[in-house]
Amino acid sequence: MTAALLPVIIILLFVLRQNLIVVLGVATAYAYWAFGDGVVSNIVVDAWDAANKDILLSIPLFILAGNIMSRGGMAARLIDLMKSLTAPIPGGLAIATILSCAAFAAVSGSGTVTLLAIGTLMYPALINAGYPKSFALGALCAAGTLGIVIPPSIPLILYGIMTQTSIGDLFIAGIGPALVLTFLMLVYAITRNFGHKEGNWDLEYVLRSLKNGIWALLMPIIILGGIYTGYFTATESAAVAVVYSIIVETFIHKEMKWATLYEVISETTKLLGSLFPVLMIALSLNVFLTYEEVPQNLVAWLSQRIDNPVTALLGINFFLLIIGCLIDIGSAILILAPMLGPIAYSQGIDPIHFGIIMVMNLEIGYLTPPLGLNLIIAMGIFKEKFWTVCKSTIPFLLIMLIGLMLVSFIPRISLFLIN
């Protein structure tokens, strides 16, 4: 009876729309009191021990780097480059939109930042070029989510922290699935807009755009190349990303003043003030659950009812798709990764592969009502009705579900670069 109250408390607090820190705080305190030694103050001790990790520094640093680039000129330069490359192709501007989102996601590491930075520039351009509003909205909302799986990805960092999985390997594993999703979106964009042609090939324009956008293109190469050649760790790569973005936007592009940089740092600091307490409580709960062998007991119970990896994958995918509709991706990873991970591992699913599957499921949640974050952001910045935005994403939701199934049941898509 005591154990059964814990999920009831969590669900009740979510129904009452309490902040995540309240939900996790109450759940953790109850768990320590009911199942531990009764000393609730041990939460602080366990949280401190669990949070004493260098890798946690990568989260604020990657967020800061993404915010700097979204306020600078990298987004516009990447868009210009993609437009120059796709001009002679039917549906060229649609292709440029998706490629710009993918490229900026590889620079910023954030889906919402990608939607804001690329969407504000490309949505008017698509409408003025005669593209259907439904396609423009859907393409930007869906392609904006690519930042969730393309490295450097904050959700992948969170998964790595909560499951003790190599973040560098997660970054590399995200490349294959990101390419699959991007390819599927491009195929749809071309077939949907085959009649549109924006212009002819202009080598001078391409070279000029490449020169202007080269610094943005170099960043993911430097970050991932540095990690996998051993020059720096995942944490150090985040610091490199911040320094690189400041140098490029301030001294090379000269599109960011010091006052603007101060504003960006201040805004990022406020965001982290709400993020880190939640993360520390989640880590404390993770320590407690591991000590009490809750994941191990859950695995033992489910192993008697799940007889093969296919059943496990289908069940986990379905569960995570539902969760993605109701809970934001960070909260879902903090709460569920330590619980679902051991279940997947017990069925022979690689931890790296499962991390990609989990993030892709929750990525789809960005496009599903009632709490789809990209839907809400698009409604605000594009001044459209919520259900208009929702309907525009339906074709892309189907595309992303196809991509999810391919990645789930063909592990080589995630693991071939690592292996």
Per-segment meaning from a language model:
Residues 1-419:
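Alpha-helical transmembrane segments of multi-pass membrane transport proteins
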